Curated annotation (Swiss-Prot):
Top-level lineage group: Archaea
Primary gene name: eif2a
Family: Belongs to the eIF-2-alpha family.
Keyword flag Translocase: no
GO MF assignments: ribosome binding; RNA binding; translation initiation factor activity
NCBIfam families documented for this protein: PRK03987.1-1
Annotated protein name in UniProt: Translation initiation factor 2 subunit alpha
InterPro entries in UniProt: NA-bd_OB-fold, S1_domain, S1_IF2_alpha, TIF2_asu_arc, TIF2_asu_C, TIF2_asu_middle_sf, TIF_2_asu
Protein purpose: eIF-2 functions in the early steps of protein synthesis by forming a ternary complex with GTP and initiator tRNA.
Subunit structure: Heterotrimer composed of an alpha, a beta and a gamma chain.
Length: 263
């Protein structure tokens, strides 16, 4: 189960809800991110267009994205809207929901291993990561790449550290992206092949220093394809620019003709 630091949501919050009961005047839903807290979805907030049957839009058991429109702390009631959620809000929420589910799954497994409750997992791990880094999932991704200091710096108790590090690698994979360029390198010098190797070797050194993977291969001389692979698209763009600038400079020194092939 997913737990939230706050006991109830705030107005305007976008949430995942599960439809529980449908009536002629609306539907009762549970809020998945608030320990299945109950909320009411009025008929008037289900669709912006006229519908004859409420079940044409929602069905029991289905998960929907809703916006909180009223919170009465005194009465303990919450009203939500389906129609006030934009397509962009829905898309972003569903993406976030997938991440929340991964965090929940990891905490469920690890808490069982160390004889803790899942709620303790949220309190001692997820909430601390949220306080320190803003997002628990992103912090776990960071821990995969940078190590357990990410967890320790957030104040996660030692008992969680090792089993968490063992488990997150099984559930969280960094999305790797690739940036490619095609260049031509020509030399009429008898030592031309060595000169071209020197030029391309400098490109490899730049990529390795930036901690990104690089592959260079011929696609039919004098054309060469340069692929760099990493997890940060902005960094890849910066590294590729540096590589091309460096190739241009060394090619000039070695009297190698260099061009970038426009794709």
């Amino acid at each position: 189960m997913i737990y939230n630091k706050n006991p109830i949501p705030t107005e305007g919050e976008i949430l995942i809800a599960t439809v529980k009961q449908i009536f002629d005047y609306g539907s009762y839903v549970t809020l998945d991110e608030y320990g299945n807290l109950q909320a009411f979805l009025p008929w008037s907030e289900i669709s912006s267009r006229w519908v004859k049957n409420i079940r044409d839009v929602i069905k029991e058991g289905r998960k929907i994205v809703v916006k909180v429109i009223r919170v009465d702390k005194r009465k303990g009631t919450i009203d939500v809207s389906l129609k006030k959620v934009t397509e962009d809000e829905k898309r972003k929420k569903m993406s976030q929901w997938k991440k929340i589910q991964k965090v929940d799954k990891i905490l469920e497994i690890v808490s069982q291993k160390i004889n803790k409750t899942e709620k303790e997992g949220w309190e001692q791990v997820a909430w601390k990561l949220e306080d320190k880094y803003g997002d628990a999932y992103d912090a776990l991704v960071k821990a995969v790449k940078e190590g357990d200091s990410i967890l320790k710096n957030a104040g996660v108790p030692e008992v969680w550290i090792k089993p968490l590090m063992e488990e997150i690698g099984k559930h969280i994979e960094e999305k790797r992206v690739k940036k490619s360029e095609i260049v031509t390198l020509r030399s009429s010098d008898p030592a031309g092949i060595e000169k071209i190797r020197k030029v391309l070797g400098a490109a490899v050194e730049i990529a390795e220093n930036a901690d990104v993977d690089i592959k260079i291969y011929t696609i039919g001389a004098p054309r060469y394809r340069i692929d760099i692979i990493g997890t940060d698209p902005k960094l890849l763009s910066k590294v590729m620019t540096e590589i091309l600038d460096n190739i241009r400079e060394i090619s000039k020194e070695e009297k190698v003709e260099f061009n970038v092939v426009r794709k």
